[in-house]
């Protein structure tokens, strides 16, 4: 798709092929710009609503602006089945930042893992080409002989998992992904702090889930054979699902509940006693390399209780499993990243 030549700047509107991922966007174009829309977003283009993207096609990494603000981090004592490690609730003031609209996908991971180190770049640990367990050989797909009663779930090796979130990624692997992305783009990509993650997940909500007091299997991917509060039972999918399949929260982020546990920067602490109030990662200066790191969000494998906005877990930084993935944040460091 090529922008029609015109005199001076103008605004162009594009309808994207995947409206779940982006509802549509407007961008300022020069008269000689060529814009290629293939799936999600356009390389290096900034949107006036606080959205920007790297790459093209299925590997597009869409980053959403998370506005500055403050919130009560942790769960209140009256929250159903809350744990002491989710408190004490404390007020946190955060600066704005960009966060990935979706968890990192298998296609995005493969793209970055395949990059060849260029002069001036310094890669760290090796990245497997695709560590995910749920590839086309293992993802169940629906087959039908023509009537709904004859539908069944089968494994036939034909599933396309490009848009499934990448899993079996350790904290070290997630950080190396951010390192390569930062060096290649000149921007500061990293994992979110625990405070950034919960603030973005809640998106102004104060309930156990950003959707309310409970959650249902049409809103997230978790083990819905169990319930939280008054929530109904439902389907247990037993695997990952494509990113963006479920509704976004109020700030446009998808898959913050369930899907995959997501790594955060912070070292693990048993409570929030002494936690930072500025949204920064809570790190132990003298910690060993194997000190546990934070995990948030729950996964496809878990009961809904684990998927609450305030629930916390941890893992050794070398830990990788079929229920662990990540998403990235980008920190504003100059005028080009201001929304």
What are the functions of these language-model segments?
Residues 1-117, 171-172, 176-183, 203-206, ...:
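Short, compositionally biased
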Residues 46, 254-257:
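Hydrophobic alpha-helical segments, especially N-terminal targeting/anchoring helices
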Residues 61, 187-188, 248-251:
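Short loop/turn microsegments at loop-to-beta-strand junctions
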Residues 73-81, 91-219, 224, 228-229, ...:
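Active-site microenvironments of metalloenzymes and redox enzymes
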Residues 79-92, 213-215, 230-240, 256-339:
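Surface-exposed recognition segments
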Residues 202, 250, 256:
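Short, ordered coil/turn segments that flank beta-strands lining enzyme active or ligand-binding pockets
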Residues 220-253:
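A short, contiguous structural element within a folded domain that forms the immediate neighborhood
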């Amino acid at each position: 798709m090529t922008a029609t030549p015109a005199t001076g700047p103008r605004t162009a509107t594009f309808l994207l092929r995947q409206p779940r991922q982006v509802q549509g966007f407007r961008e300022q174009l020069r008269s000689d710009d060529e814009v290629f829309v293939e799936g999600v977003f356009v390389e290096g283009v900034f949107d006036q609503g606080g959205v920007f993207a790297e790459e093209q096609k299925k590997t597009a990494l869409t980053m959403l602006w998370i506005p500055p603000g403050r919130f009560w981090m942790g769960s209140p004592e009256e929250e159903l089945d809350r744990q002491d490690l989710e408190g004490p609730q404390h007020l946190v003031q955060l600066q704005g930042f960009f966060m990935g609209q979706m968890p990192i996908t298998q296609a995005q991971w493969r793209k970055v893992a395949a990059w060849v180190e260029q002069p001036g770049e310094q890669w760290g640990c090796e990245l497997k080409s695709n560590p995910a367990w749920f590839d086309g050989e293992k993802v169940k797909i629906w087959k039908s002989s023509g009537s709904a009663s004859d539908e069944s779930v089968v494994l036939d090796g034909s599933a396309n998992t490009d848009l499934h979130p990448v899993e079996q990624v350790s904290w070290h692997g997630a950080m190396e992904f951010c390192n390569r992305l930062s060096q290649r783009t000149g921007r500061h990509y990293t994992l979110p702090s625990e405070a950034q993650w919960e603030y973005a997940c809640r998106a102004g909500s104060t309930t156990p889930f950003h959707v309310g007091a409970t959650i249902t299997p049409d809103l997230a991917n978790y083990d819905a054979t169990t319930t939280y509060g008054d929530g109904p039972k439902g389907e247990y999918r037993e695997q990952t699902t494509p990113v963006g399949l479920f509704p976004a929260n109020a700030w446009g982020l998808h898959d913050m509940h369930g899907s995959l546990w997501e790594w955060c920067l912070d070292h693990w602490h048993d409570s929030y006693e002494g936690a930072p109030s500025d949204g920064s990662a809570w790190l132990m200066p003298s910690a060993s390399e194997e000190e546990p790191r934070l995990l948030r969000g729950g996964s496809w494998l878990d009961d809904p209780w684990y998927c609450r906005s305030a629930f916390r877990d941890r893992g050794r930084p070398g830990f990788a499993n079929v229920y662990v993935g990540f998403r990235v944040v980008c920190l504003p460091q100059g005028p080009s990243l201001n929304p």
